């Protein structure tokens, strides 16, 4: 389900207008707080997670605010019509739905009921 959600997002960005694609990245407005929580939570709770593994999220603590500021400015300057503004809101809703689907898939695979799909990461398994 996570792969499907990511592919749906890539297709969305490919097929929509530039302003819609940029608008879908506005979830980055909230990323630093979320990444900070993820970093500490994952390091505390998962022995297979190391500081090195978390480098992507650590970089996002400073990169995400710049990316979000750029995206917000771009959307404000380019979504001038009511139709374009509605499309921007739809793009952001789509992206949040993609993120929820990913979270639901991870919950289903690794928590309850714990059905890890074939080919996925298995904690403590041959790949983990």
Describe each region flagged by the PLM.
Residues 1-128:
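Non-heme di-metal
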């Amino acid at each position: 389900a996570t792969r499907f959600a990511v592919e749906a997002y890539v297709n969305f960005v490919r097929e929509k207008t530039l302003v819609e694609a940029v608008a879908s990245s506005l979830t980055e407005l909230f990323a630093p707080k979320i990444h900070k929580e993820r970093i500490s939570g994952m390091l505390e709770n998962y022995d297979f997670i190391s500081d090195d593994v978390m480098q992507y999220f650590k970089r996002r603590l400073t990169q995400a605010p710049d990316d979000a500021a750029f995206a917000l400015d771009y959307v404000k300057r380019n979504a001038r019509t009511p139709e374009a503004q509605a499309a921007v809101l739809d793009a952001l809703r789509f992206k949040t739905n993609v993120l929820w689907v990913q979270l639901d898939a991870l919950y289903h695979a690794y928590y309850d009921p714990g059905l890890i799909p074939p080919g996925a990461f298995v904690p403590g398994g041959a790949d983990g």
